Each structure stands twice: as structure tokens, then as C-alpha cells.
Amino acid sequence: MENYDLYLPTHLIFGRGRIDELPSLLPAKGSRILLAMGGGSIRRIGLYDKLRELLSDYEVFDFSGIEPNPKISTIRRAVDLCKAQKIDYIVAAGGGSVIDAVKCIAAGAYYDGDPWDLVLDHSRIGRAIPFCAVLTLSATGSDYDNSGVISNSNLFPQVSILDPTYTFTVPANQTAAGSADIISHTFEQYLVKEGNPFTDAMCEGVLRTVFEYTPKAIAAPDDYEARAQLMMVSSFGCCGLLSIGR
């Protein structure tokens, strides 16, 4: 698969080695950046060291330990850190849980009350810290939508960097679970009372891609084409493209 860029409205930067473009996408050198992550997976695959190298001209504050289905207590701690350190930008490195958590963190940093208020009442969302998503798991489509813990047009990632090589170490069970997630998101849009020939065809293309490339990615975890195909279609599951005209 060839590298590509796509704006919808997030700037999607896809392909091997595209992570090296990160510094050109960030605010001015010296800005204060929160590096948000989950457990230890980004360290094991070398992504943490790579990001630290790319962010060497910035003041970086690590925030780790974002769990699957993030807890509001975790969000509160990150929001407090953002406020205390006057964070200018966030880099979210991980899968859907990390990226979705950062959407809430980004909004909570500009909110005077409890971030949980934003979950209960989306109309309270005002500004949000801009952020970049660096995806490590093909599943939820969080890198390309404004939803998660909360939904708001201010919560789209400005940029998402998708390098399939960072999914080579995803184990078979998580690869399969991620593919099931893509299928679920697609069927939610495909199985409606009134379809649309164009978007029906796109949904069917997503499903065919998942059915073809999931076994290949499981059989050969470092198969770049298989991982790239899954990463590509995972982004389209929640971005709204499959729902046009429905």
C-alpha cells in the first residue's frame, strides 16, 4: 500500500515512517506537550523512545497508565496535570482507550469544574487542547472521529499518524478483537432501513477487507500489507464516511 494523506476533517497521515513528520505538525519549539499513553506497550515496541527523540525540542510531560475503558479518576489526574503545567498540546500514543481519554482530557483542561460534568452534558464543552493521535491498534476508529467518552466537534484530533509497523506486535487475540470492532462499527451503519448504493459498496469493501486480511495478519504479524489494510479500514468505521446518505 502506498502512503497517503487525507483530511476529513482530521489530517490523517498514513504509512511506514510517517512518524518522522511529527515535529513539523506541532506548535512552536519549546511548547509544553503532554505525552499520554497506556501501559508499557509503546515502550516495548520502541515507540516511546522514538517519540521522545522527535519531541526533544519540547518540554514533555509523561502521563501513563490510561487503562482500557478509562476511569474518570484517571481523566481527572491528567486534567490536573495539564492545568498545573499549562500544557499547549497533547500527543496521544496508543489505541482507542488512550485516544478517547485524551479527548476528555483536552476538553477538561479548559473547564473550571469536574471533567465528569462534560460526560453528562456535552454542551458544557468549550475549548479543547489540540492533540495528535499516534495509533497502535487497528480497531475503534478513535483516531478519526470526535467521539469516545464524550462527543463534540472540538474533539477531533488535529492530526493522526498511522504507521502499520507499530501494530506488528499486536497479538492474535487482540488483532481478532480489533477486527471484530471494525466489523461491528461497519454493520451499525450498513444494516439500516434505507441504504445508499455508494455507501453500501464502501461498507461491503470494508467488510471484505477485514475478512481477507485479518487471517493474514494473524498468520504473519509483520505482514505490512495486511496490517496496513486493517489500519486503513479501522479509521473509516467511525468517521462518518460510511453513513453518507443514510
Please describe what each predicted stretch is:
Residues 78-79, 98-112, 144-145:
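Short Gly/Thr/Asp-enriched flexible loops that form oxyanion-binding sites at enzyme active sites
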Residues 1-89:
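ATP/NTP phosphate-donor binding region
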Residues 11-12, 32-34, 61, 88-91, ...:
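Structural motif
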Residues 87-105, 136-142:
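Glycine/serine-rich anion-binding loops at beta->alpha junctions
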Residues 189-246:
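Active-site segments that bind and position negatively charged phosphate/pyrophosphate groups
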Residues 20, 111-197:
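A glycine/threonine-rich phosphate-anchoring loop and its flanking beta-alpha core
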Residues 67, 93-95, 122, 245-246:
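Active-site nucleophile and cofactor-binding loops and adjacent substrate-binding regions
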